[in-house]
Amino acid sequence: TSRGLGDVYKRQEVTGKSFIEVFRNEYGYLLDYVDGNMMDWSVRPNMIFAVAFDYSPLDRAQKKQVLDIATKELLTPKGLRTLSPKSGGYNPNYVGPQIQRDYAYHQGTAWPWLMGFYMEAYLRIYKMSGLSFIERQLIGLEDELTIHCISSLPELFDGNPPFKGRGAVSFAMNVAEVLRILKLLSKYY
């Protein structure tokens, strides 16, 4: 019924407003998580999903602010960092004993699979004018295809230069995201 759809649209609007009120901060990026009065102000890549997905409560200007911060603080030639160097606890090097590597995993290493969602977000904002930037970003990943495991990408990279590949030598999720982005780019050509 039309009344039922009205309720759905009303809930959608309320949910979107609530999302913005809870997660968007005055610096233009999204809080990583909120649990009651506890808020994580760390700049992390989770916020890029709110820009990349078809349906987002953010308007275009808000999406651009999130993308700009991700570009400045998280983007590397090999993927998005899991934590900004400006945030506390930054540890970009996936080295040492298992416990040390486990700590670094979410504290600044760069994950190639996140680059797919970043690129999708970039194209949502810049459309055709963003294509050359996206192609340049793919070069950083293309170079890796002959280094670790032929035609594959490693699990992650150190978050700082020289962005050394670490973890599993072949990680399907990373390869899948590159293929997904290449398919997305083919729609523009």
Predicted regions and their residues:
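Short helix-adjacent coil turns
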Residues: 7, 126-129, 148
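Core register positions within helices of long alpha-helical scaffolds
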Residues: 53, 121-124, 128, 181
